[in-house]
Amino acid sequence: MCIHFEDILKIQMELITLRFNYFMTRLLVIGDVHGCLIELENLLRKLRYRVEQDRLVFVGDLLNKGPSGAETLSFVNDLKDDGGEVIYVRGNHDEKYLQFYNQFSNRLRKEEKPPRRLCQVWLGPDGHKTINKLKSRDWRLLLSTPLSFQTGNITVLHGGLSSKIHCKPKHLLDSKSFSSKRRAEIKSLMYIRHLRKDGTVPNQNETKGLVPWQDLYDGRFGWVVYGHQPTSCVFHKGKTIGIDTACCYGNRLTALVQEPDSQIYWESVSAKSYYANCSPPKRLRNGATAF
């Protein structure tokens, strides 16, 4: 069989492209883990995660509901110690632990165990167990979490966006000069599910006349990848992609992947069990998996 020069050149170019892509950075965005460490490890294996090449981003809520919250934080810290580029965006459950830390930091720094009932009221049924396992470096990781992360045309945050928040996502933590009302509005990024029709953030107990925040998003921050709202599969609407696929409720843990050539897709693994120490949402929204 004759092999022509053009064929050899084509094969060489394909090999060069494969090598180039291998050493280029992928973006891996992981949905709400909620202490499901086994599933996180399985998902990273499925993705063939490369600690020295890939950029790993979590949409928040590593803690609560699942069985291994403290161990998950420790695992993420180990990835960072191994040289991985790991960005952990703050979720509302992470915020609960930070509020607890701010209130009882002196006691925690002395490694005094807070009362079980106090932890359960503040953090949930497994809060006491998790608090007693957290190390100093775990608290440092939690304290370092940004409210959002932006790279290229993708913005990662936990909850949602309001068009009334005018600053860029990368500036959201630089908020010392903001009014207390503005800071509260910015922190709502962790909690938002719905907005008023004028785009403003509703009060906590407000329910009438609200619309999903995704309906009002105008694309100003590019693609928004978020968690917080558990769905049966990836939820795509407009320029928003929800990747909390309810792993702690026995469904799946999902990662959105952006390849070096900007191709976007997702991978997921099945949950090993129903873990959540609370009832599931009344209805897990159906997702849409096509762009």
Language-model-detected regions and their locations in the chain:
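N-terminal active-site segment of His-dependent metallophosphoesterases
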Residues: H4-F5, I11-F75
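A short acidic-Thr-Gly-centered motif at the start of a beta-strand
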Residues: I16-F23, R48-Y49, K80, L147-Q150, ...
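A general structural motif
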Residues: M24, V51-D54, G83-E85, G152, ...
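Short hydrophobic-aromatic micro-motifs
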Residues: V29, Q150, I154-L161, V224-Y226, ...
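Divalent metal-coordination and catalytic microenvironments
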Residues: D32, D61, G91-N92, H158, ...
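Active-site environment of divalent metal-dependent phosphoester hydrolases
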Residues: H34-I38, N64-P67, D94-L98, F149, ...
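Active-site neighborhood of divalent metal-dependent phosphoester bond hydrolases
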Residues: K65-K197
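Acidic, His/Gly-rich catalytic cores of divalent-metal-dependent hydrolytic chemistry
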Residues: R183, I192, R196-F291
